[in-house]
Curated annotation (Swiss-Prot):
Family: Belongs to the short-chain dehydrogenases/reductases (SDR) family.
Annotated TM spans: none
Record protein name field: General stress protein 39
Positions bound to substrate: 178
Organism of derivation: Bacillus subtilis (strain 168)
Catalytic site positions: 191 (proton acceptor)
Pfam families with a match to the protein in the record: adh_short_C2 (PF13561)
GO molecular function: oxidoreductase activity, acting on CH-OH group of donors
Ranges where the record places region Disordered: 1-26
Binding site for NAD(+): 46-70
Keywords: Oxidoreductase, Stress response
InterPro entries per UniProt: NAD(P)-bd_dom_sf, Sc_DH/Rdtase_CS, SDR_fam
Length: 286
């Protein structure tokens, strides 16, 4: 078993979604002994938030399985270039697309650019997100509410709506949700609401697209060490992050790749409308 850190040094970042290169320790995004088995060979995957965190881990794992990758990210260019470099070392293509996933026009352009430059689209991973803790609903402005929903939920709606113009039977859509809509979080009210919307969207789109042979599933991470954490919380909160899980530590991005590879591959051909929980041992109900 890998020896992942149970405690994190106190640290914080001033802007979201955060910079992976500034984190200490660096998130673990790759199993060095992971050997791909061509599970995604010849396929094209578009991954939002693919520059860092869980998105980086998924990008690298998909590359090892033979997929060409389009990474959609906001403006963390250094992280994106580092991920692209690692992806291309696997002998596949990697396209970087920077912009605001909360805008429908950009989402349409991202899908079209992926199809044009990589030759198609087989896998959509809706992974981008942001969060802004507040002590009370009274502290959540309309601007924050709209911004959080645009990034977390509207982006998934826009990208899915456009992607189905190109997705063929056997294709997969994977949405990143969270443990929060299952257990609640009184300081992340708007964020948790977006994740609840994603859960409903996943199930509904699974029903809507099953006739087209397109599977739609989700992954619900627990407390995971990604750039969003130091970019969200004060340093004293970061120092305790993840220690309240049964495993007593935060998860690492790499610990999700098995789920995302499974849901993208033919190994999950009889799964749709489902959510896989990666949360360090917390039991939740659906």
């Amino acid at each position: 078993m890998a020896n992942y850190p149970k405690e994190l040094p106190a640290q914080t970042q001033s802007r979201q979604p955060g910079i992976e290169s500034e984190m200490n320790p660096s998130p673990v995004y790759e199993y060095e002994d992971y050997k791909g088995a061509d599970k995604l060979k010849g396929k094209v995957a578009l991954i939002t938030g693919g520059d860092s965190g869980i998105g980086r881990a998924v990008s690298v794992a998909y590359a090892k399985e033979g997929a060409d990758i389009a990474i959609v990210y906001k403006d963390e260019h250094e992280d994106a270039e580092e991920t692209k470099k690692r992806v291309e070392q696997e002998g596949v293509k990697c396209l970087l697309i920077a912009g605001d996933v909360g805008e429908e026009e950009f989402c349409n352009e991202a899908v079209e650019k992926t199809v044009k430059e990589l030759g198609g689209l087989d896998i959509l991973v809706n992974n981008a997100g942001e969060q802004h803790p507040k002590e009370s609903i009274k502290d959540i402005t309309s601007e924050q509410l709209h911004r959080t929903f645009k990034t977390n939920f509207y982006s998934q709606f826009y990208l899915t709506k456009k992607a189905i113009d190109y997705l063929k039977p056997g294709s997969a859509i994977i949405n990143t949700t969270s443990i929060n809509p299952y257990v609640g979080n009184p300081t992340l009210i708007d964020y948790t609401a977006t994740k609840g919307a994603i859960n409903a969207f996943t199930r509904t789109m699974a029903q809507a697209l099953v006739k087209d042979g397109i599977r739609v599933n989700a992954v619900a991470p627990g407390p995971i060490w990604t750039p969003l954490i130091p970019a969200t919380f004060p340093e004293e909160t970061v120092a305790q992050f993840g220690q309240d899980t049964p495993m007593g530590r935060p998860g690492q991005p790499v610990e999700h790749v098995g789920c995302y590879v499974l849901l993208a591959s033919d190994e999950s051909s009889y799964m749709t409308g489902q959510t896989l929980h990666v949360n360090g041992g917390n039991f939740v109900t659906t």
